[in-house]
């Protein structure tokens, strides 16, 4: 799930955290809403015999959703933290999973589509990762990517999650072009909730030793349901052609050129 600076520090997730994450992410409004957007952009890119690889697949939450919708696609996933992979394998037994560093991807011209979802922000050498993904894609292959957005949203939560950065749209688009991609589609999401997100991230700093990496998923059920409804409305706007300029996250689709 989360690579990069964690590879250097050993911080962030521990083995027991992945078990908790696997239990909670299915009910989280944020994970469910992100999955719906990923499905929406990925389905037109994946014919029945296509190959898809998720870089930083974590517990397999995204791949499992894609595989349910597109059972004939050949799925695989890579993950830096081997403790997460048993959960991914149990969710999608038909997929191939590899313990791997995103900065050193051994595949060459292997996949029709690569996805990486809230992974790149953890990696200091993000340009290296994009270049490795470019090599792993077939000619004219597609990359679907999500990242946290807006440096002004930086807070102790980013530090505790071992983020290296939050992106601007121009920064990510520029890095994709430098790596050899053309950008086909961008939109912000978690846009309607951005004011609430901003206010929630203002409290005083919390010591890293007190960090619970899955605490944000333990929302009051009523609050979680209300936020899920807002995200559903937002997704409808995006499907109708609205491209939000601001939002907690950024979704991009790019093509290998």
Label for each model-derived stretch:
Residues 22-24, 143-165, 169-174:
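Short, glycine-/aromatic-enriched active-site segment of Class I SAM-dependent methyltransferases
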Residues 181-191:
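Conserved S-adenosyl-L-methionine
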Residues 1-117, 128-130, 217-221, 237, ...:
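Conserved N-terminal segment of class I S-adenosyl-L-methionine
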Residues 117-120, 146:
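Residues lining the SAM
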Residues 196-228:
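C-terminal helical/coil "lid" or tail adjacent to the Rossmann-like core of SAM-dependent
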Residues 200, 204, 245-257:
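Core SAM-dependent methyltransferase catalytic element
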Residues 127-142:
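A short glycine-rich, Lys/Arg-flanked "PGG" loop and its adjoining helix->strand segment in the class I
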